[in-house]
Structures are given as C-alpha cells and as structure tokens.
Amino acid sequence: MASVNKPRTVGVGLLGSGVVGEAIQDTLFHDLSGALGKEIGLDLRKIYTRNPKGKKWYRKRPALFTSRAEEVLDHPGVDIVIEALGFQSVRQLPQFRDYILRAFRNGKSVVTSDKAVLARYGKEIWSAAKRSGQQLRFEACVGGGIPVIRSLSESFAIEEPEAIFGIVNGTCNYILSQMEKSGKPYAEALKEAQEKGYAETNPASDVNGSDAEAKLILISWVGFGLQLQPGRIWRKGIEDIQAVDFRYAGRIGGSTIKQLAVAQRKGQAVQVFVSPALVARDNFLASVDGATNAICFAGKNSSAGRGERDCDYVLVGPGAGGGPTAVAVLGDVCELARSERKFSGVPSLIPPGMLKLQAENDIDVPFYVRFVVKDRAGIVGDIGRTFGRIGVNISEIWQLRHVEEEIQSLKQSAKLKQKYQDMLPFVMTLERTTLRQMRKALDSIRNRDYIVIDPVWFPIWGGK
C-alpha cells in the first residue's frame, strides 16, 4: 500500500485577540480536522493579548494564551507570526513595528493586517525581511476580504498599471450611501454607522481619510513602486459633506458622491489623493452601496484612448470586518505554509525610483464647489471674476430651491445663527484645473464678507 505524505506541521503564533484576531481563532479552531489542519498543517501554538481571561477562547484553551508578546515572538515552534493587533493610536505603531522586526530576527515570517504600521514603516520592515530571508504578507491591509495585492501581482505581471482607484473605506461609503438615500445629515448618518458597528466610537481615522490614505500608500507601493509616508498624500475627509450636496450631485448629470482613493499615472509621475468626489451615475463605482468596497484597475496598454473613469476590471466585496479580514490573513498564511518562506523581494510592479509622486499642487482635476453666501446682488459675479483672474474656468452654476430643513442642516453643520433669508447656497462646477490654482482662488474668496460657510469643494472624478 502506497504511503500518504502528510504535510509538515507549520506553527502559527497570533498577536492580537480583537475583532480580527478572534475571527482568525474561530476559523482555525473550528477547522482543526479540516483543510487548514490536515492538508496544510497549520497549528496555532500561542496567542498574545493584554487581557487573556476575558477572551472568547480562553476558557477552552487557556494554555495557548499569554499576556507577554515575547512568548509568541520567541516561541521555538512558531514559524509564522500573524500581527493582528489593531492600533488605536499612532503611539502604538513603533511597538507593533518592533514586534514584526523581532519576529524576523527570530527567523519567522510575518502576516499582518495592520496597514498603519506598513504605511509608516514599510521600507524599514521590508529591509528587515530581506536581511532575515523571511517573508512578509499583507493582503488584509488593503482590501480586507478583497484580494487586491494578489490581483495586482498576477494581473499586471505583463503590463504596467495606468490607474488604480476606488472605494477603500466601507465606513465612509456607508455614511455617504445613507445620506444619499435618506437625506440624513452627516452627523445622523455617522451615528447610525456607529450603532450598526460600521464605525468606531472614535471614527476620525475613517472619516478624515487617514485609513484610506494608509491603504493607498500600500497600493502605490505595489502598483507604482512609490515609497510614500503618511502626510505626503493630498487628503480630504467627508466631514463637510451634507445631504444638500447629494441633491446638487443628482442634478449634475445624475451623479453621486463617493470617497475615492486614487493613484493615477501622469507620464513619469503618479497623481495620488484621497477625497470625496463627484462620480457620474454611469460609472460603476456610483452603484457601490453601503459598507462595500470596490477597486478598479486600468492597464497602460488596454486603457489607451479611453477615459480615466474606465478600468479593465473591478474587485468588489466586503472591505472590512473580522470575517473577511481573517480570510485574507489566513490566505496569506496558507500560501506561506505551502512555500519555502524565503524572502522574494518587494512586490512592486514597477521598480522603486522609476516614477515619482506628482507634486500635490500639480494635481489636475475638475472641481465641485458649494458656496453658502449672504443673499445680495453681485456675489456670483464677484466669485466668477476671481476664478477668471486666476485662470480657473467655470463650467456650470447651479442654484436649487432649498427647503428649510436643508438650510437648518447647513446652519447646524457650521454652528451658525443666520436667519433663513440671509443664506443663499449654490454650486459651481469648474473645468479641469490644478490644486494650486484652486487653493489660490478659494483663499481669495473665503474671507470676503459675503461668505457665510467656508466653501465645500472636492474633485469631479472622470470629468473633462
């Protein structure tokens, strides 16, 4: 009788027992007799968390838990370390980086779901992986359950990416979707997202765009070889968007508003930004609803002659949550378990240094601008002349009849006390211009005595 070769056992250590860490434990412990245990040979050998006794699996498997991270990082039977600590403050990031570096020094490969650590310390971490000869995998950092990194590596192996863009934060997409559907003010939509578990108690990293920024840093690294740092990307949050903006968006070609992360090649530079954007209804991204994420890819050759809104294919799915993220993490772990786990290089499709980051002020897009001014003659003309002097061309001007509820919502968002008749909202769409010109024009306009609320402005994606 022929002997059956059993897979060698691969020891796994887990840092973190929060939402993602617990979902990883659920999958591994429920599958001990299944594919992960028998066919791949995964064996979870140690779990670090600060307070083990309160955790779901502690009662059944107390010996696996520890409150000392070094018991995972220095464990002789651990081959792969999963870092799923989930940061609450940037002050934690140096420590999480040190955990990853220690794992490499001890000859262990690392799988992480922590985008913030890689966005800030990616270059240092990759250098350490190379020195140690170990692997680093981070599929879960970008798309949660969507295989963004794997798709980039496989699909663009024979051609360079031209653009990678899409919706990478489910919290923001849920909030904006609710504002559009129900007409709720931003504050109410955010509260609902928190009640349903889509937004954290402190939602700042989601709504101000920093979560999307970290993901975009990794996308730009893999797709374009850019080694960026947080703070170098132009970033706008969604906090100033109000339901009235969706009414105007609907009138402007049936558009909607989505928070987009964009990396788009412009010659030898890459235009990179995170911002809410006006998206035309015929664009696929306009139909992506709720907490769903979607990422579009366009190749340099196949995109020739097409508009920047178009893409070769789209990945859609749940971008966050314990279950989808655990699937992505364990997919990386399984891939490492099947391989020799030797360092295979930085996974950039374009060698680092070939392309540069486009200067922030040179970002070149059309814009949507919502003004709220005092109701008196000559204001629209004055604003138009200011844009004209700076070389910014107005495409259209929109003024809707506003119900009092919309006016009250605008007043509350800006904490104003002006009477209803004193406020006149209207929208301008601007032809393609640079961020430098846009800022110069708005700096000139915003301090004039007729401005009631600071202008709300953001790109029109795919506009001419």
Residue ranges and their predicted role:
Residues 15, 328, 333-464:
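A conserved regulatory-domain signal marking ACT and ACT-like small-molecule sensing domains
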Residues 161-165, 173-176, 180, 192, ...:
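Catalytic, metal-anchored helix/loop core of enzyme active sites in primary metabolism
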Residues 62-95:
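A structured beta-alpha segment of the ubiquitous adenosine-cofactor-binding alpha/beta core
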Residues 31-58:
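NAD(P)-binding Rossmann-fold cofactor-contacting core
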Residues 130-211, 218:
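Rossmann-like NAD(P)H-binding beta-loop-alpha module
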Residues 188-287, 291-294, 321:
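Substrate-binding/catalytic subdomain of NAD(P)-dependent oxidoreductase enzymes
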